[in-house]
Amino acid sequence: MLRLGMISIREYITGDNVNVFRKWLISLKDKQAYVRISRRIMLLERGGFGDCKPLRNGVWELRIDHGAGYRVYYGMTGKEIVLLLCGGDKRTQDRDIEKAIAYFEDYKGRIL
């Protein structure tokens, strides 16, 4: 998926007011990973999706080729709005995908 142009980046907040993606990002002990993920989000904002793939139920996976194989899960809530759902790495990928799908369904049920 390659798009050029400005994309609005938003972060999913649970019904309990928890920003799941931000909580995960700041908990990373690998500071280089933190920087690389932050840069990918900035690139995403400019329309550069790079290495990503669709999963299911409208959830996508943004892959960061560093360390543990970090992933950022997101959904598109419009043509120009990306909702960051959660993150993880290759080791927790299956669980993270299930969480991301549940978060996106929750978001759509509450917001859309």
Provide a role label for each language-model segment.
Residues M1-A68, G78-V82, D89-L112:
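Basic, Lys/Arg-enriched alpha-helical interface segments
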